[in-house]
């Protein structure tokens, strides 16, 4: 398990245009540093290995207005993705069961949200719940305003760049 964490720490989750996920080396320098023994503290190295999935999740959430952490065989996940498709809202999906390190991501999501079930849905950087919670927000008329709020923020950021 430790070798998996070490491999995870040196990589970054990326998505292709087709929507598939894969791992990309974060930096060759990280591997060189570890190989040369320049790690100053074993406990801080282990701490970094523990936080790598959390950091990658947070980066994904901050880069996208809607993120659905899902599993391909989950009917609730399918229901949540359909809701956003029907609303004509772009979303980023991370299929945990297709990732080599999906269990570590699910553990990190548990630490962040208090639950291991999927889907885990984030809108505008905030965890809103699972499929049932998302449908409830939609029926109450609160979901679309959250999504629009995010798109407005992102468009304003682009104006000032």
Curated annotation (Swiss-Prot):
Q: Tell me what organism the protein belongs to.
A: Pongo abelii (Sumatran orangutan)
The record's listing under CDD domains reads: GRX_GRXh_1_2_like (cd03419)
Q: What biological function has been recorded for the protein in this entry?
A: Glutathione-dependent oxidoreductase that facilitates the maintenance of mitochondrial redox homeostasis upon induction of apoptosis by oxidative stress. Involved in response to hydrogen peroxide and regulation of apoptosis caused by oxidative stress. Acts as a very efficient catalyst of monothiol reactions because of its high affinity for protein glutathione-mixed disulfides. Can receive electrons not only from glutathione (GSH), but also from thioredoxin reductase supporting both monothiol and dithiol reactions.
Stated name of the protein: Glutaredoxin-2, mitochondrial
Q: What is the lineage of its organism?
A: Eukaryota, Metazoa, Chordata, Craniata, Vertebrata
Q: What is the activity-regulation note?
A: The 2Fe-2S present in the homodimer leads to inactivation of the enzyme. The 2Fe-2S may serve as a redox sensor: the presence of one-electron oxidants or reductants leading to the loss of the 2Fe-2S cluster, subsequent monomerization and activation of the enzyme.
The transmembrane residues are none
- Gene3D superfamilies in UniProt: Glutaredoxin
Binding of glutathione: at which residues? Answer: 71, 106, 118
């Amino acid at each position: 398990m430790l070798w998996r964490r070490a491999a995870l720490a040196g990589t970054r989750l990326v998505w292709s245009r087709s929507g598939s996920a894969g791992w990309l080396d974060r930096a060759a320098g990280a591997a060189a540093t570890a190989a040369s023994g320049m790690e100053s503290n074993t406990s801080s190295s282990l701490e970094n290995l523990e936080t790598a999935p959390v950091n990658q999740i947070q980066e994904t959430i901050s880069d996208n207005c809607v993120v659905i952490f899902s599993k391909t065989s989950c009917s609730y996940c399918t229901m949540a993705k359909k809701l956003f498709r029907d609303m004509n809202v772009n979303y980023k999906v991370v299929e945990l069961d297709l990732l080599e390190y999906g269990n570590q991501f699910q553990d990190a999501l548990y630490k962040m949200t208090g639950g291991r079930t999927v889907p885990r849905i984030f809108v505008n950087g905030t965890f809103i719940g699972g499929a049932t919670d998302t449908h409830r927000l939609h029926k109450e008329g609160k979901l679309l305003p959250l999504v629009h709020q995010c798109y407005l923020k992102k468009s304003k950021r682009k104006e000032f760049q």
